């Protein structure tokens, strides 16, 4: 479920991606990267009921059988300088998750310089500052039923172009691709989203965690 503005789960809402025969499923909730809205989990003041998200697997005694909850929301900066995300959480019960991934998104309009490699340095610097100041528990509140070790906070970097978007500005034998494995934030990877109103031109390799790309004779790898 992705909303352009607000996304609200009512106090009695149940999202069930659990299973009795395999690994649990994935529930994705989020807002558009430039949204000023909120992802809200309500609580019933009378009964105390809160939304339930079930991603449990077949065997609750096997941690890796659990499913995944992915929250994709814009970043925020608090009055005290700490950083958070656009989530208002009065209480939500998460059942059986092996991990809860929080993608804290910032959108960059790169129309004036529509090259992925030329935009990553600034985005990486912003992401490192954001993660260093992150107060994730204050930003999300309490997601009950899941251990703290299941939380993963990672920066989402969305590069948007009003025209074409090209992976490499100057592709060559020595500049044949982008290796994202060097971009880590407390051990977590970035989540890179590329959007182009025109053409998305992949004129090199894009990898994370593999061997260094090998240049082709014309400098382009497809």
Regions found by a protein language model. Give the residues of each.
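Extracellular and secretory-pathway beta-repeat/beta-biased strand scaffolds
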Residues: 1-222
């Amino acid at each position: 479920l992705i909303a352009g503005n607000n996304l609200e789960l009512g106090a009695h809402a149940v999202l069930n991606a659990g299973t009795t025969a395999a690994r649990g499923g994935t529930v994705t909730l989020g807002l558009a990267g430039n949204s000023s809205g909120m992802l809200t989990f309500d609580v019933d003041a009378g009964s105390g009921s809160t939304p339930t998200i079930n991603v449990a697997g077949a065997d609750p005694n096997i941690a890796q059988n659990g499913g995944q909850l992915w929250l994709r929301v814009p970043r925020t900066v608090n009055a005290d300088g700490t950083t958070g995300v656009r989530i208002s959480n009065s209480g939500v019960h998460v059942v059986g998750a092996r991990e809860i991934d929080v993608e804290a998104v910032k959108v960059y309009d790169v129309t004036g310089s529509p090259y992925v490699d030329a935009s990553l340095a600034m985005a990486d610097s912003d992401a490192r500052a954001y993660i260093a100041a992150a107060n994730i528990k204050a930003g999300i509140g309490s997601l009950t039923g899941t251990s703290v070790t299941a939380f993963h906070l990672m920066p989402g970097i969305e590069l948007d172009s009003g025209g074409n978007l090209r992976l490499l500005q100057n592709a060559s034998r020595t500049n044949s691709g982008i290796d994202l494995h060097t971009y880590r934030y407390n051990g977590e990877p970035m989540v890179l989203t590329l959007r182009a109103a025109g053409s998305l031109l992949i004129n090199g390799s894009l990898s994370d965690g593999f061997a260094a790309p090998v240049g082709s004779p014309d400098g382009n790898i497809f």
